[in-house]
Design a protein with these regions (language model features):
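Conserved alpha/beta-domain cores
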Residues: 141-441
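Acidic, glycine-rich flexible loop/linker segments
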Residues: 2-179, 183-184
Length: 441
């Protein structure tokens, strides 16, 4: 089919609101479309306003997110990937409504989504709120000057970086004046270039050159938007949940992804290394961040492969610093060995770190969704920072919401925190909060 097929009219004469977890603010109304039907129909020309409703976000749907007005998911929490993307694109979103409520919500032709209150309301008629999301037409105004009320100079030696998931966010990136891109999530950023297939299969089918050209063009746009500020490129994590539904993943050992995947099959890492070096990483202040490093051996495997790549290119020294993600508890015990092996910096990922320490899932909803506000996570981050400071490794803390309690932040700064990276909608608030807190103290 070449168009979106509306769902049949609800048999319910009256609706009752469904409570979930609001993860991306705003109130929006629109016509209901099933996420599963969207995947099966592959629509070509959807007309807003559209509210997508489904179990969870899958890769096939991501290119359509820029065209929808609201998102409702049965699964997920505040740090789930669907929530992260919705916030970056400024789409009102409610997650965790529960599978039992999906059929009920899908029986209505219209919905309103309250991303602030976490409420979804089924409607028989078109709601009054029917505008497209503001993000679908990003502002083109000139950014405020540094040290304005919008962007105050921080009274502490701390870098504020932006986390980037989508190419469409580049205009917002320019408007928010971050100190650079603290984390470019390659899995999301390049997902549409894989055309529904796992990257390993796509490369094996002979698309290496095509992918390299497309990767380079897209990454170059990011560098031009922030030059001369740094960009921290997180390498593709082939174990990522976002890739598990793609064609060809069945041949890959999903239980051992992360950086081990690059040791098992370096084809994706080779593609990334070629692109990063073609861009002249020495002049562009690029950093390669290896994902989900569990052991020193995994890092050494990636490092050795990179050194072999350099020799093949006729280079003897690397202009590309190698960083790692600190996402699993084992990193805390191995930092000295990792530094000795050549790690040059660390990005702390509290979303994964929290779920592995506390036995939680980032895709779950409800009160047990912690990130930076749990005392145990706070203590783990403090220990990581004290050790990286002792080893003279610059460290960035990734925060989805940008909300860090002031007393925690003071502890992190004393322990040697170098930078924070957060989602674009939270950059201004984070900078202003830090400035106001220190001026008041």
């Amino acid at each position: 089919p070449s168009s979106w097929t509306p769902l049949p009219e609800s048999p319910h004469k009256h609706s009752h609101p469904i409570q979930g977890q609001g993860v991306s603010g705003g109130v929006q109304g629109g016509q209901v479309y099933s996420l599963q039907a969207l995947i099966l129909q592959s629509p070509l020309s959807p007309e807003p306003p559209i509210i997508l409703v489904g179990q969870q976000l899958t890769p096939e749907v991501i290119p359509w997110l820029r065209r929808v007005s609201g998102l409702v998911l049965a699964q997920g929490g505040a740090t789930s990937h669907g929530a992260i993307l919705a916030r970056e694109l400024e789409i009102p979103a409610v997650v965790g409504v529960g599978s039992a409520h999906l059929e009920y919500l899908l029986s209505f032709p219209w919905l309103t989504v309250d991303g602030d209150g976490g409420i979804v309301q089924g409607l028989k008629e078109c709601p009054p709120i029917a505008a497209s999301p503001a993000t679908n037409s990003l502002p083109q105004h000139q950014p405020e000057a540094p040290d304005s009320p919008e962007f105050p100079t921080l009274p502490v030696p701390l870098k504020i970086f932006a986390t980037l998931n989508q190419l469409t966010s580049l205009n917002a990136l320019r408007d928010n004046l971050p100190d650079g891109i603290g984390l470019l999530r390659s899995v999301w950023f390049f997902l549409d270039l894989w055309h529904g297939e796992h990257p390993h299969r796509r490369i094996a089918q002979g698309h290496h050159g095509e992918l390299r050209t497309a990767y380079q063009k897209r990454l170059q746009q990011c560098i031009q938007a922030i030059h001369p500020r740094p960009l921290f490129y997180r390498s593709v994590d082939c174990r990522a949940a976002e890739l598990q539904s793609l064609g060809g993943q069945e041949t890959f050992p999903w239980t051992v992804g992360g950086s081990f995947a690059h040791c098992f099959d370096p084809s994706v890492l080779n593609l990334e290394l070629e692109v990063l070096h073609q861009i002249d990483c020495g002049a562009s202040d690029l950093h390669l961040v290896l994902p989900m490093v569990r052991t020193v051996e995994e890092f050494r495997g990636c490092r050795d492969h990179y050194q072999q790549f350099l020799r093949q290119q006729g280079r003897h020294q690397s202009p590309l610093p190698l960083w790692i993600m600190a996402e699993v508890p084992s990193i805390l015990l191995q930092l000295p060995a990792l530094a000795a092996a050549g790690v040059q910096g660390v990005v702390i990922g509290p979303g994964d770190l929290c779920q592995y320490w506390l036995g939680l899932s980032r895709e779950q909803s409800g009160p047990l969704t912690y990130e930076l506000d749990h005392p145990l996570v706070h203590q783990v981050i403090l220990q990581l920072l004290r050790e990286t400071q002792r080893l003279k490794l610059p460290t960035i803390l990734s925060s989805h919401s940008g909300h860090i309690p002031q007393n925690y932040l003071e502890d992190y700064l004393r322990a040697g925190l170098w930078g924070i990276t957060t989602e674009l909608p939270h950059l201004k608030n984070l900078r202003q909060t830090i400035a106001q807190s220190w001026h008041a103290s």
